[in-house]
Amino acid sequence: MKYLAGDFDVVVIGAGHAGCEAALASARMGCKTLICTMNLDSIALMACNPNIGGTAKGHLVREIDALGGEMGINIDHTFIQSRMLNTSKGPAVHSLRAQADKKRYSERMKHLLEKEENVVLRQLEVIEIDVEDNEVKGVLTKNGAYFTTKAIILCTGTYLKGKIIIGDIIYSSGPSGLYPANDLSQSLLDLGINLRRFKTGTPARINKRSVDFSKMVEQPGDEKIVPFSFIHDKLDKDQISCYLTYTSEETHKIIHENIHRSPLYNGSIEGIGPRYCPSIEDKIVRFPDKDKHQIFIEPEGENTEELYVGGMSSSLPEDVQIKMYRSVPGLENAEILRTAYAIEYDCIDPQQLDLTLEFKNINGLYGAGQFNGSSGYEEAAAQGLVAGINAVLKIKGKDPLILKRSDAYIGVLIDDLVTKGTNEPYRMMTSRAEYRLLLRQDNADLRLTEMGYRIGLVKEDRYNKYLNRKKNVENEIERIKKVQITGKKEINEFLLEKGSTELKKPISLYELIKRPELDYFKVEPLDDKRPNLSDDEKEEINIIAKYEGYINKQLEQVEQFKKYENRLIPKSINYSDIKGLRIEAIQKLEKIKPINIGQASRISGVSPADISVLLIYMERKNREN
């Protein structure tokens, strides 16, 4: 029987990585927040890989942190190994990655929600969204509890009509054998929301005692640990190694012989899977010229023997999986603790959302994470944070937070989903960001902390720390521009020793650093008045000095980009009235409802000629008004 159970400003449905960030942001900005999860023991569950960060994903975590989110702080408290990736490449693609203690990561996030003053945490299944006159009114749970609310954030992950597939065995389930949410999908369909099926998968978990590490290459953590969160100066930890091995000829033979039993190839799987995280059987079919594939053996925590077999997700039958895993060097006697599986789930076409992550046709209803068609913990957390922030800003009658593509990877992520849409689980990559030299992970705080402070998520002590770092970097840049280095004998000897050329005339230290063989760290012996700076401040100064030319070019590109971004399109515009617009362009523009010319220009099916017609129309209307 239905009963009135309470009133909240914001209700968050789901307590995965998106839901946790959404609820914490909402509560910390002063809104009374209910977060519902089907299992209190699966909060911030790492249902797949036991790590946070990685290429482009590390950028997202740093940005979440700079805006006042929790993911970076949580992994700093619960990591078991840390590595900076892509250090042989330029700073734009340097990405931090940390192995997590999965259980501790989840437990700490749960405890944060339990302690947060404005959060009410409940184990409940929401089965219905109540909407009147295109505005949310409340949610109904399976046990009859009805909660009124001003905003609802859907963070359902892979639970909506979840279906696990292992060979020809198919059953209704959420991830890791958890209960699926089978009723909510119908409520969303009744509201006119378009749903579709996506698929993801996870590899087996094996027992550490059954692994022969002597046949693998050890992958230790970095000696110098770099924190994810800008609030942490240094971290110290006894780290646990990962290991690298490869598939064998026998692995490929087993898969080829049993490919007819793969749900991917016999029609059992309807959902579309992630292009950039294919199953092992998909890799072997798609890349027949490769005789081996990398397999990473990753620990799942300090107090467990479970190991994650990275790079080997599968939906093959269990009997095939056992043979397949045991054909990998070092895994000849592997004991499987959890079978690999594929999972299908309902999600939305994100083009139904606007750039605040609110549904265009339902006031107060937001989506975040895998529900929006993305993949990955970090992508989910970023969307959850933005949805939580915007729900509160709307309730308070304030302007929304809309991050541009030139502001953050989060801006690229949301713009791609909402403007371009996605026909497969969307994964963030550095190649998706046009201005990646400006959107480095090292400067996320310098880019976004001001925004986080203005909206009330970044507190005073954190803000003061940011101001101090900003001032130190700016002051040091100014100082080294004034320090003159002359061609003295001992200086030229030093330069020759470093593989550089002699000085013929005085040069500033700032210009000297630009030489390919030198950097801010190497020229320290020439700089006796150098102030005491932190490692991250020194790194920031080095990047700004060495890459100044490239950075300035991208800044010029951003100025051009902003001209289109600042040309706002009136909400009242009727595209059908615009003569010269192609029918496809009219349909796409009416569907997406872009807020500015920049967004309109990125819609698939809208040509540069259509944009010219639209601009001429807007100019004429402006003159008439």
Curated annotation (Swiss-Prot):
Main location group: cytoplasm
Binding-site residues for NAD(+), renumbered to this chain: 273-287
GO terms for biological process, alphabetical: tRNA methylation; tRNA wobble uridine modification
Keyword Phosphoprotein (UniProt): no
Keyword Disulfide bond: no
UniProt GO MF annotations: flavin adenine dinucleotide binding
GO cellular component labels: cytosol
Annotated FAD binding sites: G14, A15, G16, H17, A18, G19
Subcellular location, record wording: Cytoplasm
Coiled coil: none
Function of the molecule: NAD-binding protein involved in the addition of a carboxymethylaminomethyl (cmnm) group at the wobble position (U34) of certain tRNAs, forming tRNA-cmnm(5)s(2)U34.
Stated name of the protein: tRNA uridine 5-carboxymethylaminomethyl modification enzyme MnmG
Species for this entry: Clostridium botulinum (strain Loch Maree / Type A3)
